[in-house]
Amino acid sequence: MPRVKGGYVARRRRKKVLKLAKGYFGSKHTLFKSAQGQVMKSLQYAYRDRRQKKRDFRKLWITRINAAARLNGLSYSRLMHGLKLAGINVNRKMLADLAINDEKAFAQLAEKAKASLNN
């Protein structure tokens, strides 16, 4: 039985892995075996962090809204409840943007939330 080396198929597979490993430290970007392990781990991190990014941004928006709400005499939860009672449907991303870039508009929303909480 003749020896089979794999030919261009194996070379193509290895080149694909080494291309993904470009820029890695040490032997992880030159040696196939260590590169393959690192590429697999990197893809796992990428998959996990694409989901975690959504959570992280939501946390950031809530922190910013809470800070701005406290400057206007409300807590985050009371502000959100007041906005819901007032029928103002604004998502957290937009509220956080208003809190940073347009403090007057955010203050007006906070006043409307306060008014709807008092009624």
From Swiss-Prot:
Gene Ontology terms: cellular component: ribonucleoprotein complex; ribosome
Gene3D superfamilies cross-referenced by the UniProt entry: 6.10.160.10, Ribosomal protein L20
PROSITE patterns to which the protein is assigned, alphabetical: RIBOSOMAL_L20 (PS00937)
UniProt keyword annotation of Ribonucleoprotein present: yes
GO molecular function (one): structural constituent of ribosome
Job of this protein: Binds directly to 23S ribosomal RNA and is necessary for the in vitro assembly process of the 50S ribosomal subunit. It is not involved in the protein synthesizing functions of that subunit.
Name of this protein: Large ribosomal subunit protein bL20
InterPro entries named in the record: Ribosomal_bL20, RIBOSOMAL_L20_CS, Ribosomal_protein_bL20_C
Pfam family, one: Ribosomal_L20
Keyword Signal in record: no
Gene Ontology biological-process annotations: ribosomal large subunit assembly; translation
Top-rank taxon: Bacteria
Keywords: Ribonucleoprotein, Ribosomal protein, RNA-binding, rRNA-binding
